[in-house]
């Protein structure tokens, strides 16, 4: 059977995985990176998700640098399996949960990409004074360029705000709803302005969930 391994490199992604991943019967990791591999019976296009180089300052001290997560699927993608000795930290990879490989209930490709985008947007989270515009602009992109409904956008932005320790997270709860009703919708240019990067950089991140500039 074909397997999909969701390889988590940035620990921030684990917080979103706990929220949205649902049931997974096969999880492994190692002491320096526990619960970093989720495995299902499935087939997906393999992809590595990395922050573009002009955002490197946000992950300067991360153990895996710009790499956030990776979808490993197919025989060409090598995964260190439980029982193996990890070459970098000289520690054994071990199962943390193993009850066989289950099929994912729902759209696995969508949820893995959603987790990865949320991870990036949380790592890049705006400083105080710019957070409301940042969240409003994220909502604008998702309203205009995805098929997500208001409830999903509302939850996505609220959870990013919560995990980013935004003390006004409650005020971000209805961003999808309000963005859809707004006469003027902010989008990628506003996010790029806040983060002081190019619009194409932001477009790259949102392309992970199928949104294009």
Task: Identify the residue ranges that each predicted region occupies.
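Short alpha-helical segments used as structural interaction elements across diverse proteins
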Residues: 27, 69, 128, 169-172, ...
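Residue-level signal for threonine
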Residues: 31, 187, 201
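Beta-rich nucleic-acid/ligand-interaction surfaces
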Residues: 32-40
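Charged/polar, low-hydrophobicity segments characteristic of intrinsically disordered regions
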Residues: 163-191
């Amino acid at each position: 059977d074909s397997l999909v391994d969701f390889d988590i490199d940035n620990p921030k992604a684990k917080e979103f995985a706990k929220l949205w991943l649902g049931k997974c019967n096969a999880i492994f990791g190692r002491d320096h990176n526990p619960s970093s591999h989720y495995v299902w019976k499935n087939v997906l296009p393999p992809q590595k998700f990395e922050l573009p180089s002009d955002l490197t300052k946000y992950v300067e001290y991360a153990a895996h640098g710009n790499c956030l997560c990776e979808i490993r699927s197919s025989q060409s993608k090598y995964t260190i399996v439980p029982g193996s000795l990890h070459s970098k930290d000289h520690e054994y990879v071990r199962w943390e949960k193993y009850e066989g490989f289950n099929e994912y209930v729902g759209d696995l490709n969508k949820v893995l990409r959603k987790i990865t985008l949320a991870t990036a947007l949380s790592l890049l989270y705006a400083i105080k004074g710019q957070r409301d515009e940042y969240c409003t602009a994220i909502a604008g992109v998702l309203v205009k360029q995805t098929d997500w409904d208001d409830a999903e956008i509302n939850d996505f932005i609220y959870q990013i705000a919560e995990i980013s320790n935004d003390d006004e997270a409650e005020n971000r709860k209805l961003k999808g709803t309000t963005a859809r009703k707004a006469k003027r919708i902010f989008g990628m240019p506003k996010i790029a302005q806040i983060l002081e990067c190019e619009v194409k950089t932001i477009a790259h991140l949102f392309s992970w969930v199928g949104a294009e500039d």
